[in-house]
């Protein structure tokens, strides 16, 4: 029988999109089956952290120009955040290991908001560096505590998927949040970008308060017990792979804006698209890991 041209055209368009739909299908299925309000709150938290960490990459030239420092000096603001990450996780273990998990998450999300709000108001380079350090303090601790919470609220046999859903917020930040922050910095000011990250931190704080259930603290095994797992080789191998992988990414990504502008010849107006393409690569990598996350590793 004769098919109307319009119907054939619609089916052809749908067929063209089928590889993309198949690519996202496992992720969509996991979100539909396992998405809970508490996981949404955690994903909003990692989204705020992703913007807080990576937004510097797109606005680095604007900050250097505004504060009257060189690009390498402005790059130290990225290092200050990383230093805060290194100090924040063990500091949380020392100070809050006996506190309820929800209280810890509330304190960490509040610190995201406060750190970025103060960064938006920083009067000079050194104050901004201090606030970048403060903004980095909750990063590692939030992922650690958030992973425990995600595992506790997950359905039986779906703990890994629950943690992956929480981390989706970070990849969404790279895909949409960081390019948006770059665009806002170009149009308005880098201070406005940090203020928006602070607002997102407040949103995450509100959702954690409303949707994350109260949970008892982890059993207190003492300070030595917290690091007993480091006696075996496997954690050191994981730490080494993460360190090398992230080190390689940051060596390139930290200075993507000046490299694209001064070396490759792109304009500042192109930065938003470039940052978005980099974010899409991270997003695609997370999707691929989610697709294969339940498969045996050996």
Model regions: which residues?
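Extracytoplasmic
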Residues: 44-71, 253-257
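Helix-breaking motifs and short loop linkers at transmembrane-helix boundaries and internal kinks
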Residues: 68, 100, 121-126, 265
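Conserved MFS/SLC helix-loop-helix module at the cytosolic interface between two early adjacent transmembrane helices
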Residues: 87-123
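Paired small-residue
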Residues: 115, 126-134
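Cytoplasmic helix-loop-helix junction between adjacent transmembrane helices
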Residues: 131-168
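Helix-loop-helix hairpin linking two adjacent transmembrane segments in secondary transporters
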Residues: 156, 165-209
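Juxtamembrane intracellular "pre-TM" segments in multi-pass secondary transporters
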Residues: 212-238
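Residue-level detector of conserved catalytic or cofactor/ligand-binding positions
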Residues: 288-297
């Amino acid at each position: 029988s004769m098919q109307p041209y319009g119907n054939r055209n619609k089916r052809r368009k749908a067929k063209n999109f089928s590889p993309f739909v198949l690519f996202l299908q496992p992720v969509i299925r996991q979100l539909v089956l396992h998405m809970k309000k508490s996981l949404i709150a955690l994903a909003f938290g990692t989204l705020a952290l992703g913007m807080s960490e990576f937004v510097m990459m797109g606005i680095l030239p604007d900050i250097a120009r505004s504060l009257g420092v060189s690009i390498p000096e402005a790059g130290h603001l990225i290092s200050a955040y990383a230093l805060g990450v290194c100090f924040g996780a063990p500091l949380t273990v020392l100070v809050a290991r006996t506190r309820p998990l929800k209280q810890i998450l509330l304190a960490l999300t509040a610190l995201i908001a406060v750190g970025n709000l103060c960064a938006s108001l920083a009067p000079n380079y050194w104050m901004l560096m201090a606030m970048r350090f403060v903004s980095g303090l909750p990063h590692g601790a939030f992922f650690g505590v958030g992973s425990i919470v995600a595992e506790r609220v997950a359905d039986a046999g779906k703990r890994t998927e629950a943690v992956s859903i929480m981390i989706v917020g970070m990849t969404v930040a790279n895909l949409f949040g960081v390019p948006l922050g770059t665009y806002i910095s170009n149009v308005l000011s880098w201070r406005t970008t940090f203020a928006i990250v602070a607002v997102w931190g407040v949103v995450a704080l509100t959702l954690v308060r409303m949707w994350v259930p109260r949970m008892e603290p982890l059993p207190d095994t003492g300070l030595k017990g917290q690091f007993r797992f480091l006696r075996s080789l496997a954690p050191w191998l994981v730490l080494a792979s993460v360190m090398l992988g992230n080190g390689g990414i940051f060596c390139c990504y930290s200075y993507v804006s000046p490299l694209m502008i001064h070396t490759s010849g792109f304009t500042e107006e192109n930065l938003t698209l470039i940052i978005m393409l980099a974010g899409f690569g991270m997003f695609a990598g997370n999707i691929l890991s989610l697709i294969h996350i339940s498969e045996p590793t050996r």
